[in-house]
Amino acid sequence: MKRLLFFLTVVTLVSCGRSFEKRTAKYAEVGEVSDNRAAVLDINEGVGRWGYVDGTGRLAIECHYADACRFADGMAAVQVPEGAWGYIDTVGRFVIPPQFTLAEPFEDGMAWVQAAGELWGRVDKAGKMVIPCLYSEIGEPDERGWMRVLRDGKWGVLRQDGEVVVPCAYNLIGEPNAYGLIPMTSDGKHGFLGADGREVLPCFFSYISDFKDGYARTNYGGSMV
């Protein structure tokens, strides 16, 4: 009986795979299936529009988007013909209206979005801006969930929930050293931030080495100390 059930399962899967391929053969492009939806590109009279099919290849969301991302967390970023990006659910309803210049798929309930002249921020599934679109660069989070961010040419540090750890006031913020101290630079002077993000050694020095055996060499007032 187990062998028969296994055989029937395999036959069903093969049949479904063939049906999907047959039904989606008419599309110029077919994306990966995620959340039982796959993005498809339909070209009509030279104009391409994206929509979504279900796992069997049947059209689930009409093809009227200028661009479309894969579904994740039950939502997908799509671009309307006018140019703005928003997020739809699996039946094609806008959950977050088109308002962004760029939008990425959701991950763990949040997504990166771009607005206001190529500035990045982060939005949750309810459309709330967890991190406002103020940053030209946002780094990958470290093991603490801290991210280096660039705003108006100055670096700072945020937590993933948007809380400011270090204000955007420095020309450079480096990686923590073995002591957990974070090197930073401001107006050509160097110093260190503590593990909590507060200044422990202000930017007074024209040169400062990394710490070794608890000490660091500095140049202060033209002298090495």
Q: Model-flagged regions — what are they?
A:
Residues 14-15:
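C-terminal motif of bacterial Sec signal peptides marking the signal peptidase cleavage site
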Residues 1-4:
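Positively charged n-region of N-terminal signal peptides that target proteins for export
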Residues 18-225:
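Residue-level detector of conserved, function-critical positions
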Residues 7-8:
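Sec-dependent N-terminal signal peptides
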